[in-house]
Regions:
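Amphipathic, hydrophobic secondary-structure cores in small proteins
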Residues: 106-109
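Catalytic core of pol beta-like nucleotidyltransferases
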Residues: 1-86, 95-99, 111-157
Length: 157
């Protein structure tokens, strides 16, 4: 790999890291934390948190594949905190066919006894964190003919 390629790769890594930090802050905010609480948790100043959130890029304009690549570890951690497991992406993002305006299709194993209200709330939280429309389905929660197709293309996060 050439030095130019190494430089470009490093720039891409920086962009993914910036997006991941932003998504992590949005996740903390979605969980009800104040900027002051976030700052204390991270060991940074509240103005630093405020500045990062104020510089919040329009995540709607971020390529869905790049957004999932950056946000995957954050939303997986958020899901696990809430008892969800086996988080994966399917659909156009998994097939590398997503357009700029594509939604993100996620599949997850909900905790035992999760109500429909709680499941919809989790989907709404993911939309808030990622800044775009999310289609969230549960393993086994689709029509039998569709499950096989979705499972075949699901990429674990």
């Amino acid at each position: 790999m050439s030095l130019r390629d190494e430089y470009r790769r490093a720039r891409q890594d920086e962009e993914l890291a910036r997006l991941r930090r932003l998504v992590a802050l949005r996740a903390m905010r979605a969980r009800g934390m104040t900027q002051r609480e976030i700052a204390a948790e991270l060991g940074v100043s509240q103005p630093a948190v405020s500045q990062q959130l104020a510089g919040d890029v329009a995540l709607r304009g971020v390529d869905p594949e790049r957004l999932v690549a950056a946000a995957g570890p954050v939303i997986k951690s958020l899901a696990e905190e809430l008892g969800y497991s086996r988080l994966g992406v399917f659909g156009s993002v998994a097939r590398h066919e997503a357009r700029q305006d594509s939604d993100i299709d996620l599949i997850v194993q909900a905790p035992e006894g999760t109500s429909s209200f709680a499941f919809v709330g989790f989907a709404s939280m993911l939309e808030e964190v990622l800044g775009r429309e999310i289609d969230l389905v549960e393993y086994g929660g689709l029509a039998p003919g569709l499950d096989a197709d979705i499972l075949a293309e699901t990429v674990p996060l």
